[in-house]
């Protein structure tokens, strides 16, 4: 049986209003999807986890008229709808279809990110087991790719790595699987630290190899390698602190930076690091360098 699917681009603040309205006009299901690939972690009880840019998908039984649904929605919500799209889709195995959307991804020469339900394409490669979802997004965001590709190209043997803003732990876990001696993770979100611990366990990484801290608990480490995939503003503000956490001769990789923000972030680190040319991917950049 075919279904009518209506997709709306919404903000988190609009979620409850539009969810209730869709159910009121007869939707058999309402789901939320990440519109950009932003990590988001397990929510507190009685809260709805949402991304800053979210797609709401409402599913209706076949034969439902899209124009009628949209007209009733505007009446219920009191105004024009946000950007939207409707289409008729054929019935299918929805769980299988969702899983099929996420295939193993290769970063650099050695590293693969592999969903748990999929066989590793190259069993002898470095395979990081990580399922897409709340703790990871799809994994295709350019900032993540830039950092993973950089790590894949480094000699990490016997290195101590610091993942500042570790989120799901993907960068630290990748570093350990690529040969790092130890990785330290820190994040402002306790739930992110829990996600990192869970993902490390899936990859056979012992707790002592990947200690995790809130920022105020972070010891004064001297890292051989520091990675920070956060945002340009915090990277600039934290430049003195982050620079101080890298030993002389140590390496730095920063991302979460839009192309137009690259020069500002680079300038904040230029006095302490010999910087490489800025790497760019799909409007995002990565800044790397070596501590003087």
Swiss-Prot record:
It is an enzyme of class 2 (transferase). GO terms for molecular function: protein-lysine N-methyltransferase activity. It comes from the Bacteria. It holds the Pfam family PrmA. Keywords: Cytoplasm, Methyltransferase, S-adenosyl-L-methionine, Transferase. GO terms for cellular component: cytosol. SUPFAM superfamilies: S-adenosyl-L-methionine-dependent methyltransferases (SSF53335). InterPro entries: Ribosomal_L11_MeTrfase_PrmA, Ribosomal_PrmA_MeTrfase, SAM-dependent_MTases_sf. S-adenosyl-L-methionine binds at residues 144, 165, 187, 229. It is found in: Cytoplasm. HAMAP family: Methyltr_PrmA. Methylates ribosomal protein L11. This is Ribosomal protein L11 methyltransferase. It comes from Pseudomonas fluorescens (strain ATCC BAA-477 / NRRL B-23932 / Pf-5). The lineage of its organism: Bacteria, Pseudomonadati, Pseudomonadota, Gammaproteobacteria, Pseudomonadales. The gene is prmA.
């Amino acid at each position: 049986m075919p279904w009518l699917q209506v997709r709306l681009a919404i903000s988190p603040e609009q979620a409850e209003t539009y969810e209730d309205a869709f159910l009121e006009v007869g939707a058999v299901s309402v789901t939320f999807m990440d519109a950009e690939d932003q990590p988001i972690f397990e929510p507190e009880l009685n809260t709805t986890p949402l991304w800053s840019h979210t797609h709401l998908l409402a599913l209706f039984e076949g034969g439902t008229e899209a124009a009628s649904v949209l007209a009733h929605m505007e009446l219920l919500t009191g105004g024009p709808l946000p950007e939207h799209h409707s289409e008729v889709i054929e019935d299918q195995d929805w769980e299988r279809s969702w899983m099929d959307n996420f295939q193993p991804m290769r970063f650099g020469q050695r590293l693969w990110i592999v969903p748990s339900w999929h066989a590793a394409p190259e069993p002898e490669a470095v395979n990081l087991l990580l399922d897409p979802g709340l703790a990871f997004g799809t994994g295709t965001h350019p900032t993540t790719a830039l950092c993973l590709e950089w790590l894949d190209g480094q000699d990490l043997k016997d290195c101590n790595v610091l993942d500042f803003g570790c989120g799901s732990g993907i960068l630290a876990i990748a570093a350990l699987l690529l040969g790092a001696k130890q990785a330290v993770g820190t994040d402002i979100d306790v739930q992110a630290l829990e996600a990192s611990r869970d993902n490390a366990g899936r990859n056979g990484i012992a707790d002592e190899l990947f200690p995790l801290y809130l920022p105020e608990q972070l010891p004064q480490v001297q890292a051989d390698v520091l990675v920070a995939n956060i945002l340009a503003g915090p990277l600039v503000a934290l430049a003195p602190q982050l620079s101080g956490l890298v030993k002389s001769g140590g390496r730095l990789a920063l991302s979460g930076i839009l192309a137009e923000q690259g020069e500002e972030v680079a300038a904040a680190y230029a006095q302490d690091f010999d910087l490489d040319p800025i790497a760019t991917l799909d409007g995002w950049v990565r800044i790397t360098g070596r501590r003087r």
